[in-house]
Amino acid sequence: MSEENKLSESEIKEEAVQTLERINFWISNCDTKISFSLAFAGILLGGFFSSGIITGSLNKLMKGLKEIDKDTPYLKIQYLEITTIVLVVFIILMIVSLTYLFRGKKGSIDTGVFNEADLSKDSILFFGTIQNKSFISFKNSVIEIKKDDLVNDYLSQVYINSKICNRKFTLYNKGVNWLIASTIVFIILNGMFLFL
């Protein structure tokens, strides 16, 4: 690469700042999506546990299971067992979905997990390291920082936040996939409840 095509230090810093802003936007975007998914899961669970039709059907299911005896028709026993299995599957899918979504929503500020050469560990940009300093110490760090160290700090934050963003979206996507599966099972379960 020729020297005239290389970015200057100020251009590198500006690009890093813009990239960091974009990544932070995507992190915020993912948190918003997770919040909407959690709200949907809450509505689904709220509807499940507060609906008179569903609670009535659950009571009928439990009563039907308790009253199974040698005179109960085989198909009725099978239907009650399958309905119970579908109910358990719905609950498990919902728990898995909520676990992924809450893990995605959880903040991650442990920079200790990012141990790579040249990665800035004493950042003047990251609130987690700033809050560990006194104001005087932080102020002196900002005043005394060299240009190349500041650029490295920005690039480090871009790298770390990219990792955080990727983790959030991975957990969000898994959570949504499990939520979709639990919604489908919820619909099937409601259909099965109609025939109890």
Curated annotation (Swiss-Prot):
Any one GO BP annotation for this protein: defense response to virus
Transmembrane segments: 34-54, 82-102, 176-196
A GO term, aspect molecular function: nucleotide binding
Alphabetized UniProt keyword annotations: Antiviral defense, Cell inner membrane, Cell membrane, Membrane, Nucleotide-binding, Transmembrane, Transmembrane helix
GO cellular component terms listed in the entry, alphabetical order: plasma membrane
Function in brief: Pycsar (pyrimidine cyclase system for antiphage resistance) provides immunity against bacteriophage. The pyrimidine cyclase (PycC) synthesizes cyclic nucleotides in response to infection; these serve as specific second messenger signals. The signals activate the adjacent effector, leading to bacterial cell death and abortive phage infection. A clade C Pycsar system. The effector gene of a two-gene Pycsar system. Expression of this and adjacent uridylate cyclase GmPycC (AC P0DV42) probably confers resistance to bacteriophage. The genes are probably only expressed in response to bacteriophage infection. Probably only responds to cUMP (produced by its cognate NTP cyclase), acts by impairing membrane integrity.
Protein name in UniProt: Pycsar effector protein GmPycTM
Organism: Gulbenkiania mobilis
Lineage: Bacteria, Pseudomonadati, Pseudomonadota, Betaproteobacteria, Neisseriales
